[in-house]
Amino acid sequence: DWQALSNPFEGMVESLDPEQRKVFNPADYKEKPFANSNRCLCTASNNTEVCTRCVDVCTTAAITVHKQSVLINDDCRKCGLCSAVCPTETLSTRRHMPRQVYDQIARVASAYEQCYVTCTRALKRIPKGNEVVLACVGDLSRDLWFSLLTDYDNISVYLPVGICDRCKTTTGEATYVDAIGTAEEWAKASVGLEVDQRQMTHELTRDYKRSQFVSSAIHSAERLVSRTTPALAGAQAVAKKISDHTKRIDEMQRQLEAAVGAKTSSNRQRMLTQSRKLVMGALQHDPGLAKYVDLQAPMFDSARCTACGECARVCTTRALDLDTNGMVTVQNAFCVSCGACAKVCEEGALTMERMDTEELIVPDEVTERIRAQKAKA
């Protein structure tokens, strides 16, 4: 057992001091979401019928929209489904933002042969190093699954047969089935499924072990006067991979805003959601997948438009812009395919049609520069 060899004193400490032994508490993996009402499509339009995704998925009717506020009462089960289905990220949690969850799963998938995503009801014990526990597997959105599938092929869901049938979060199964199914179609890859805990493997990857071994051989003398350890070397390699991914996404956003502008014609700041950043990062990594990504965006018919401004008002990501000449333009990168603009347009000047997802691909400047240099040579 490589893990036991890496940390031989862990079990000894727990046996000597029972108070130090961790106890599984499902509440540790759950978190009540908070709302940024300024992003809500219903508050922006003063119409609760414009978007009902969070209300529809909530099994306890804990979410209400009152005037300009999104309210979450104490009946909330802390399942996280509302944040997963909200297109504008109005609802979110501090420990389970899309990029945080991506980093957590990517860190595990990079270090272990197999990464397991599961829920508190399924596991019922302290998770091992390669087990990511959520309040509900439906807490992961379609976009997050897509981003993970483009980068890793060793992610599985662990759910025993029938576990969802007895769950009070009755909308959870349908939510994760839809999210994973769509992500698999887009990524042309699949998420594994494990139903038997006895069949789960907890081995570190060969690359991770190799980095520890090489560090041990090279730095054996240095470790006498420093804190460098073989185990730390493997962790540092994984951390660098995650850090590089974050830097790549941040740089991609900078390039996007430089190309199309970070603000609308009325000087309002556009918002690129974390989920959309992950999708665009995945497409930058593998542009060939763009043709499989099925998203919608509003198409504008100027002959029907009265320039009332309702569409621009309801678009909280500011993807849609209505200029002083009465022309509507849509920046697809910022459009979350919510359809709210088309719903509030009484004249039918906006209709939702398939988006040209090629527009979501932001060329990597470094890669393009290297390609240009090779072409000259």
Residue spans of the language-model regions?
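Flanking helices and flexible, charged tails adjoining ferredoxin-like Fe-S electron-transfer domains
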Residues: 1-32, 38, 42-47, 84-198, ...
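Ferredoxin-type iron-sulfur electron-transfer modules and their immediate structural context
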Residues: 1-57, 115-120, 200-206, 215-306, ...
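Iron-sulfur cluster-binding cysteine motifs and their immediate structural context
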Residues: 47-71, 77, 81-99, 310-327, ...
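Extended, alpha-helix-rich binding/interface surfaces that flank or overlap catalytic cores
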Residues: 336
